[in-house]
Amino acid sequence: MSGHSKWATTKHKKAVIDARRGKLFAKLIKNIEVAARTGGGDPAGNPTLYDAIQKAKKTSVPNDNIDRAVKRGAGLEAGGADYQTIMYEGYAPGGVAVLVECLTDNRNRAASDVRVAFTRNGGSLADPGSVSYLFSRRGVVVVPKTDGLDEDDVLGAVLDAGAEEVNDLGEAFEVLSEATDLVAVRTALQDAGLDYDSAEAQFVPATQIEVDVDGARKVLRLIDALEDSDDVQNVFANFDATDEVLAQLDED
């Protein structure tokens, strides 16, 4: 894993903007439903469901929507769909590697949406395995900055729980661990009285390609097109950009 990724900062800000638009609500609800179906409807005994609910609450998803998603997933309420996880791999303009994580009840629709997004935005789909080796599944916890909280405070709280790295994202800290240590790291933060925005397993790139303003715009255009699909849950890409490039993107 390379050091601090400025793209992570942009991604964090983008998530906040998307949430304000309500774009994330359906995806967060789907996460809850699938977590409840996989591990049961009790958050106390299902850490994945607990974290999915916490993220939805942080994003202001109404409690009623959350409760109904849990019930659908647990089979207590009708209307739940049979979602499958499907991964697609491809390249954005400039050779940036892209992993697309879909959660869908219609494989053909998902495949079509992903293919169209790549072809219309200068990218290309790749064979399975040609991109995924560049990423590893990691535990990622985002901790908002509060007055007086610094990197050492966060690291001190999570080091014994298996955390490997703490990155400063500007408005928040990002704690990285093995995916299997995610719950332990999140619990350690809670025990230390530290709030967190999200705790989830993500695909983190081992190396990153630095892009200029034009390159960043092209990659982000592709990511936006992919995320517009209801079937796409997450998009991961191995690109980074300097502060100057990010500042220009903010002006767009």
UniProtKB/Swiss-Prot annotation:
Keywords per UniProt: Cytoplasm, DNA-binding, Transcription, Transcription regulation
Identify one Pfam family in the record. Answer: Transcrip_reg
What InterPro entries does the entry give?
A: Integrase-like_N, TACO1_YebC-like_2nd/3rd_dom, TACO1_YebC_N, Transcrip_reg_TACO1-like, Transcrip_reg_TACO1-like_dom3, YebC-like
Q: Which GO terms describe its molecular function?
A: DNA binding
Domain of life, per the record? Bacteria
Query: Which family does the record assign?
Result: Belongs to the TACO1 family.
Name of the protein: Probable transcriptional regulatory protein Bcav_1989
The organism is Beutenbergia cavernae (strain ATCC BAA-8 / DSM 12333 / CCUG 43141 / JCM 11478 / NBRC 16432 / NCIMB 13614 / HKI 0122)
